[in-house]
Amino acid sequence: MIEAKQTGAQAPAAASPERPAVVARAFGALPDQSASLALLRTIADETCTPGPFAPRQPLALYGAGNLGRLARDHLRAVGEDFDLVVDRNAEALAAGGGWAGTRLVHPDAVDTEMKRRAMLAVSIVTSPYAPLEAALSAAGWRDIVPFYDIAESFRDRHPLSNGWFAEPFSDNDVAAIGAVLSAWDDDLSRAHHLQFIAWRRLRQEWSFDGAPVTIDDRFFIPQILDVMRPNERFLDAGAHHGSVTARFIAETDGQFASILAIEPDEQSRAVLEQTRGGFPSDQRSRITVSDALLDSERRTVRFHHGLGYASQISPTGTSERATQTLDALGAAPSFVKLHLEGGELGALKGGIATLRKYRPIIVATVYHDADGIQATPAWLMDNLDGYRFLFRLHSWCGTGAVVYAIPEERQ
């Protein structure tokens, strides 16, 4: 079994008087099949049961980037106040106008009393959490928690689910997860899958030498770029404002056959249409925008709209929508991207005929619910013959997890 590296570091300081800091474990090598199964058993044998944290006042956010803006909007949506936002670029952000009405403060300008009294919700997932938590603790902050762990306490009224916690694993769970670990095409996938599981089950931050978390290549890792061809037919499900569509066009240098960009949220789709309108006419004519709400079958569901990235099928939604299957779209994709806030497995099931007929490259996010640990990758592995499967992390705190399915004939 691979052992965690001995760093000589002292035990981390508590994130608050009530809870310990996040434990970081660094491993010196990538895990092969045997080592990954042993490490999975280590996770399964842990008895801790971490859970969400209700916010308390005064509340501060740390980080004013994309996640910081999402955190701000989420807290406002659930009626939770916050006092300030701490960011090293506070002055420039304040001048930009995107944070009008919000108190933005440089970390060095926060007074000692605020650090002692406030709960600090970290809204950054583009760097490791544990060393940031340790640095904030050393700077005098007394109560530090990942923002997503706070968001999880509002699931009864807001569907944002990126802070979910995995339940303890039974022996059957361990066997099923182990089968997926063994089936990945490379040891890097096993390392990232274990890192994902350790955060979700234990709130431990694992890392492996040779397994960097890459922020900038989500959906377009080298193994995907190596097999992309001219004239791909791209299906972008969960297109949001069109950033992935734009990235696809850039990666193909505009040499694609068609793009079907699917976005069920009206507000996001309006921005998507603007994005489409900004492309040259010869590219714009090959892009179709759809409002389809993908699922495993046609049915009527509640849809929570107006939440930007987090809009999704949810009991908290106030509108009723008819879902549609990928098969019913009549598309013939050669490349399918799914980012559906937990709806990925349902969309895959509703597209089985299309996937088997056209054998596209598939890239799907799997970090929005517990299906990502085993059910979604296992479904792909069980239902698509002649594919190789990879797992990659593109951010920290158990987020940014993507499964990649590449047809063997693309080699």
Outline where the language-model segments fall:
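Phosphate/nucleotide-binding beta-alpha loop and adjacent structural elements of enzyme active sites
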Residues: 2-62, 68-82, 88-411
